[in-house]
Amino acid sequence: MSTLRLLISDSYDPWFNLAVEECIFRQMPATQRVLFLWRNADTVVIGRAQNPWKECNTQRMEEDNVRLARRSSGGGAVFHDLGNTCFTFMAGKPEYDKTISTSIVLNALNALGVSAEASGRNDLVVKTAEGDRKVSGSAYRETKDRGFHHGTLLLNADLSRLANYLNPDKKKLAAKGITSVRSRVTNLTELLPGITHEQVCEAIREAFFAHYGERVEAEIISPDKTPDLPNFAETFARQSSWEWNFGQAPAFSHLLDERFTWGGVELHFDVEKGHITRAQVFTDSLNPAPLEALAGRLQGCLYRADMLQQECEALLVDFPEQEKELRELSAWMAGAVK
């Protein structure tokens, strides 16, 4: 019986693909070596310990229907589109070794005619006339008895969009999380015009088989039916939830300030696990009572645009004469935390 397993996803849903990855990783026998090939439609994928409000322009992502997905490995934020080919290598310990999977990807690139090399902690680069250019970034996860190495290859990604979503507006965030490392990148199509996702997957698959001296049939994972993986439904529900993607952010503080016709407002939030643990309001408004009441209502509130709006608009019952001010405040807060 082969010790290899090859899975290929035909879904572009990041939450689906990351849930598949998690389920395979949890239930695989320690003697198995797994290759999972996949790709995502427009998504910002952040590391396990990252703060999406710091790493991403969440407002623009919402406007452009770009999803946020938190992975279970560490590392920085990256933008995925269908121009990225994603790979995951898994193995039990002591065999798990990220240098093995790195060499498999390098061999695959070499077979395609691209000479690349490992650089730094998790990148693959090619040499160009303008200097080294990154074509792949990776992250890793290990448990007591197994590990995985996953990453992306930039095939024909829309690099102009990276700055749209990974360079957020300057917010006054004092974060305790991890700030992403920005790198100079290039697409494989700059080196191999016309190269396709299918060709890259085939090269990685053949390099995988060659390394282990075995072959195995590919298993196609499709969203058309629930994958036959233990606890997949529960894992997908968690992976796609606000509580996981946003609520797992490290503790941080956020200062919002704006001047309205009726006065200036400063809001200071301390946020932990997606909930406001402290809210302070400062204003030169001639009627500060609604804002003072708002600070109390926001304590313990989810740090989510719709919840902030809900708490703000609830004050209309007690302060109907300030309806205009409260609605302006509500709209501003919702836009500021997206």
Curated annotation (Swiss-Prot):
Among the GO molecular function terms of this UniProt record, one is:
lipoyltransferase activity
Main site of residence?
Answer: cytoplasm
Q: What GO cellular component entries does it have?
A: cytosol
UniProt-annotated binding residues for (R)-lipoate: 134
**Cellular location(s):** Cytoplasm
Q: Where does ATP bind?
A: 71, 76-79, 134
- Disulphide bonds in the chain: none
**Gene3D superfamilies per record:** Bira Bifunctional Protein, Domain 2, CO dehydrogenase flavoprotein, C-terminal domain
Give GO terms for biological process.
Answer: protein modification process
Enzyme Commission designation: 6.3.1.20
Quick one: which pathway?
Protein modification; protein lipoylation via exogenous pathway; protein N(6)-(lipoyl)lysine from lipoate: step 1/2; Protein modification; protein lipoylation via exogenous pathway; protein N(6)-(lipoyl)lysine from lipoate: step 2/2
Which keywords accompany this UniProt record? ATP-binding, Cytoplasm, Ligase, Nucleotide-binding
Provide the BPL/LPL catalytic domain boundaries. Answer: 29-216
InterPro entries, per the entry: aa-tRNA-synth_II/BPL/LPL (IPR045864), BPL_LPL_catalytic (IPR004143), Lipoate_ligase_A (IPR023741), Lipoate_protein_ligase_C (IPR019491), LipoylTrfase_LipoateP_Ligase (IPR004562)
Q: From what superkingdom does this record's organism come? A: Bacteria
List the catalysed reactions: L-lysyl-[lipoyl-carrier protein] + (R)-lipoate + ATP = N(6)-[(R)-lipoyl]-L-lysyl-[lipoyl-carrier protein] + AMP + diphosphate + H(+)
| Quaternary state and interactors | Monomer.
Q: What does this protein do?
A: Catalyzes both the ATP-dependent activation of exogenously supplied lipoate to lipoyl-AMP and the transfer of the activated lipoyl onto the lipoyl domains of lipoate-dependent enzymes.
The extra comment attached to this record reads: In the transfer reaction, the free carboxyl group of lipoic acid is attached via an amide linkage to the epsilon-amino group of a specific lysine residue of lipoyl domains of lipoate-dependent enzymes.
Family designation: Belongs to the LplA family.
Q: What is this protein called?
A: Lipoate-protein ligase A
Query: Gene name on record?
Result: lplA
